[in-house]
């Protein structure tokens, strides 16, 4: 059991460290994409609040993970 724990934690740490190394190697090229995503979220989701009945009638759109609904 201890070997499984050690192997799983080692695998997790190596994947986590690899992600940080790739991010450092990639640099800050994804900053513009993050800014675009924040603007998209602010414009489409946080500014347009809908009622509970509207929310039930409309399906979730692409990239819509949460929905703010007024009761």
UniProtKB/Swiss-Prot annotation:
Its main location: membrane. The chain crosses the membrane at residues 5-22. Keywords: Membrane, Transmembrane, Transmembrane helix. It is found in: Membrane. One of its GO terms (cellular component) is membrane. It is a single-pass membrane protein. This is Uncharacterized protein YufS. It comes from Bacillus subtilis (strain 168). The lineage of its organism: Bacteria, Bacillati, Bacillota, Bacilli, Bacillales. The gene is yufS.
